[in-house]
Amino acid sequence: MLTLYSETFPSRLLLGTAAYPTPEILKQSVRTARPAMITVSLRRAGCGGEAHGQGFWSLLQETGVPVLPNTAGCQSVQEAVTTAQMAREVFETDWIKLELIGDDDTLQPDVFQLVEAAEILIKDGFKVLPYCTEDLIACRRLLDAGCQALMPWAAPIGTGLGAVHAYALNVLRERLPDTPLIIDAGLGLPSQAAQVMEWGFDGVLLNTAVSRSGDPVNMARAFALAVESGRLAFEAGPVEARDKAQASTPTVGQPFWHSAEY
């Protein structure tokens, strides 16, 4: 179970709704993955090039999954705040995935503006989930601003590279043990999702890895299983890696010629 802002969700997977081949494939993918939330933007085109209209909203409602609006495409504090306020009116929710991009090539979050926008939105009653980097200090500033959960990237959006800064992500997990951390952006394979879940991250948000795959419906299922498996492995307590071999079978009753004295 995933807990965010005192609200509990049955899944640790969050799924984006952009760039699917057709609305029907999107709907099937959501139903297959059974995510905790589905993200949607007011500023992006819908499936098949259609604008976000009543039909797209109806499709999202049919899934029965809570909607997490985002501020994708925003590059200033005022732009992000205005978009969040509009999203609250349209989708009737206080949840917002706060995105504030600082570089058009890498789509890296502008953490300075992100903190400022988060402070404003939290004071306005929003439940803010900020898309951020794995920088520990920036993440602390977001927590100081009132955020109760964070969404650090694994790699730049849409790259599918997996966790490129594994050390920094593990440090972040270790130093913020009580903060829900959801890996957002850069995952391309179910194995990569399982890996970060094994490290103790609380959830994963995906879009491109599913929507642009050869079979989004089956890929959605693969990621859902990977996230669940990774979490189970973390909770089970994996064995530590060793440099020296260690037999797994008992040595009681072994032949005398195997003894050290022989």
UniProtKB/Swiss-Prot annotation:
Domain of life: Bacteria
CDD domains given in the database record: ThiG
GO-annotated molecular function: thiazole synthase activity
EC number: 2.8.1.10
Catalytic activity: [ThiS sulfur-carrier protein]-C-terminal-Gly-aminoethanethioate + 2-iminoacetate + 1-deoxy-D-xylulose 5-phosphate = [ThiS sulfur-carrier protein]-C-terminal Gly-Gly + 2-[(2R,5Z)-2-carboxy-4-methylthiazol-5(2H)-ylidene]ethyl phosphate + 2 H2O + H(+)
Membrane spanning residue stretches: none
GO biological process: thiamine diphosphate biosynthetic process
Keywords for the protein's UniProt record, in alphabetical order: Cytoplasm, Schiff base, Thiamine biosynthesis, Transferase
EC supergroup of this enzyme: transferase
Main location: cytoplasm
Cell compartments where the protein resides: Cytoplasm
Pfam families: ThiG (PF05690)
SUPFAM superfamilies xrefs: ThiG-like
Keyword match RNA-binding: no
Residues that bind 1-deoxy-D-xylulose 5-phosphate: 158, 185-186, 207-208
Pathway annotation from the record: Cofactor biosynthesis; thiamine diphosphate biosynthesis
GO cellular component terms attached to this protein's record: cytoplasm
UniProt KW Transferase keyword: yes
Catalytic-site annotation from UniProt: 97 (schiff-base intermediate with dxp)
Region ranges (Disordered): 243-262
Similarity annotation: Belongs to the ThiG family.
Biological role: Catalyzes the rearrangement of 1-deoxy-D-xylulose 5-phosphate (DXP) to produce the thiazole phosphate moiety of thiamine. Sulfur is provided by the thiocarboxylate moiety of the carrier protein ThiS. In vitro, sulfur can be provided by H(2)S.
Assembly behavior: Homotetramer. Forms heterodimers with either ThiH or ThiS.
Name of the featured protein: Thiazole synthase
Organism placement in taxonomy: Bacteria, Pseudomonadati, Pseudomonadota, Betaproteobacteria, Neisseriales
